């Protein structure tokens, strides 16, 4: 590993991690300089590491297609103290598998995977990709932002035909979070890939021990790490000690507890990732001047750059394109973007010629509502047969559903004299709030899997700029007894492999979401018979009553849907029950048409039977009913590449009517092209009409 020295800030705890590496000198400077200089936002040293494409590589960390597809995750030589390289390997393994269906029947190794080339053919063997990585922090000088930036430059990069693809992390994942969603396509195309972790990055602080994560996933104490930790809780050591005494075995998380409202910066840090990639490419391919330093070969706008990713990363790409004032971004391709749109009067979302009940709500609104109602709505007749996605016994889950319905009814929040009617009313309220009937069978698994509770709690903390010591709405993050769910000390600290195995939003990697009741902290699902209704209702009230500054902080993350006439593609699954299409993509496209008018170059592809988590597609009931949206994300990237490089027109906005695999849950037939119709130039009756602030999606 080589490291390029930037700013002066460097933690003592990093010294051992840098052994075996070299520090290369570079100064910060302005864009008009003739010498390549690190952007001013880069803090500390840049680590440069070369990978041979055999023992280790950019895409698979040396695991290859076979290793990524194996259910046996890579281990550590010393489980108590894994190396940075081992943590990187586990992070790539975990994040790759978290974004796509990894089963052969589901498409891995046939439609996507390291062995599959950009034409969809199995020609690349194990798919290892040689090249170089550049790793650094972006910071504002406070040492508290510490956004992780990473650039991968494949050995196949052609300096005469340069390209960059952004791969901003989805969810609250670490810097490798979008390696399967966008990084893989970019590397295969021979492009540099610009990653960032959005200032969430799976950074955690173990309150009882003071242990924190560093940029490479290795650990240090908060005091020794100083300002070089991924995240350290802002409270004083005495305050944290008192909190730990009252609430032991708790964890602070960066996205939830940094008090930064990091989402407001997601567009900016994505642009920084691109600028950092420009610097890396100039460093690698620029002419040598004065014998040691490199000159400027590429200036803003010289490199074909596609802002890409999915979910939160997709929203970040859209925000970056809107904020781009220097020509960093050429085009945008995103999947299922989590985006909060600033809607203007007159903008309308229709389906089948009729206005939808609700659209354009921010995540803080729809997530807190869904978290409140989903456990009850899951008992509705329309949700019968939903895939079961919980480790709890079915009897426990059914009891939770019944009790949540009863408590909602007692509070006057749903109507009905029995569970069935109460559940139907809860589901009807979700319809009225903009959820589609296409999502009926996903309401249960979105809550049972704890995806929605995790989102509601983490984002409520972020949008209120809460501290870990606030225990917002009596929720916190803790290790628990696997049988009772009560807070308990872990047998082995989850911090050891957190960088490699965690996803940044508890419950993850043994750190669970707990509700702090009279008897102490317990897994929120088990803390009360109605699964911590009081906490869920409190989260909802934060939004409805505009408490703790939530409205102001949500306004700070809204976007205008002005892509500045850049060519763009949005892909979204119609059945998405985590990021409902009415509130995200449909609303964005409608607002974009009002903002940009006929100058807009945005195409929108809505995928029937597509939902948010392709990694769930191997679960019984998911396999038979839903199709991979990732397949269309890759098709969209190919379409955009052809548009940029050969002038091929982008297909117009359309509904893609897929065919579920069917069969027996857990044993669906192999995915085939019969399930996946192409995106077409002439969609006919499947065309989505977009004009002057109105989008009309065919039924």
Curated annotation (Swiss-Prot):
Catalytic site: 311 (charge relay system)
Family to which the UniProt record says this protein belongs: Belongs to the D-(-)-3-hydroxybutyrate oligomer hydrolase family.
Pathway(s) served: Lipid metabolism; butanoate metabolism
GO molecular function ontology, one term from the record: hydroxybutyrate-dimer hydrolase activity
Organism: Burkholderia mallei (strain ATCC 23344)
Annotated EC: 3.1.1.22
One annotated GO biological process: butyrate metabolic process
Keywords: Hydrolase, Secreted, Signal
Pfam family membership, one: 3HBOH
Descriptive protein name: D-(-)-3-hydroxybutyrate oligomer hydrolase
Record localization: Secreted
GO cellular component: extracellular space
Lineage, opening ranks: Bacteria, Pseudomonadati, Pseudomonadota, Betaproteobacteria, Burkholderiales
Statement: the UniProt record of this protein carries the keyword Flavoprotein: no
Top EC class for this record: hydrolase
Keyword Signal: yes
SUPFAM superfamilies: alpha/beta-Hydrolases (SSF53474)
Record function comment: Participates in the degradation of poly-3-hydroxybutyrate (PHB). It works downstream of poly(3-hydroxybutyrate) depolymerase, hydrolyzing D(-)-3-hydroxybutyrate oligomers of various length (3HB-oligomers) into 3HB-monomers.
